[in-house]
Amino acid sequence: MAFIRRTVQTNIFEEFYPTTLAFNAGKKNYFLGHSKDKSYMIYNMTDAGKIEPTVVVQKGKLKTYLQNIQAFYDTTQNKQYLYGYNLDEKVIDVYQIADNASIVLMYSEEFTVEDSIKSATFFIINGVLCFYTQSDKTKNWYIYNLINY
C-alpha cells in the first residue's frame, strides 16, 4: 500500500492548539482544539474531513490543561467519552460526549502513581471504566478499574 500526502485545507485559528482530537458524535464529525490556557473549541467537520472554522459547536474552558486526549465508547450503555490527562499535574479528567458533540465533565481525579507514568489510556470493558498506565523508568504497567459508587 502506498500513501500520497496532499493538502485538502489550510486556514488559521486564533489560538494554537497543542492538544487536538477528531471524533464522531451523532453520526457527524467534529474537531476539538485545546490550548494550554485550558480553553477549547469544538468545530464541525465536513464528510470530506475539512474543519469548518466558522461553525463552533461548543467552546469554553476545561478544568485542567490536558496534554493528551482520546475518545472511547461504552458499547453497553451506548455512550461516548473523552478522557484526557496531564502527567505533570497528575490529573485525569473524563467528559461525556453528547450526540450534539457538547462535553460535560463526569469524573476528575488527582492521582499518585507507583512509578513515573509516561504512557496512559482509558478503555471500557463490560461497562467498567479502566485506566492503563506504564512507567518509562521501570517499564511496570498497571490497570486500574474506576468504579462509580
What spans do the regions from the language model cover?
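Beta-strand initiation motifs
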Residues: 1-6, 48-55, 100-107, 149
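Surface-exposed loop and turn segments in beta-propeller and other repeat-based domains
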Residues: 3-12, 56-63, 109-113
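Repeated scaffold domains used in trafficking and secretory/extracellular systems
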Residues: 12-26, 61-74, 113-125
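Entry beta-strands of beta-propeller and related beta-repeat scaffolds
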Residues: 27-31, 77-82, 127-131
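Eukaryotic tandem repeat interaction scaffolds
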Residues: 32-73
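Structural motif
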Residues: 37-44, 88-96, 137-146
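Loop/turn-rich, solvent-exposed surfaces of beta-rich toroidal or solenoidal domains
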Residues: 66-73, 80-90
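Blade-level signature of beta-propeller repeat domains, shared across WD40, Kelch, NHL, RCC1
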Residues: 119-149
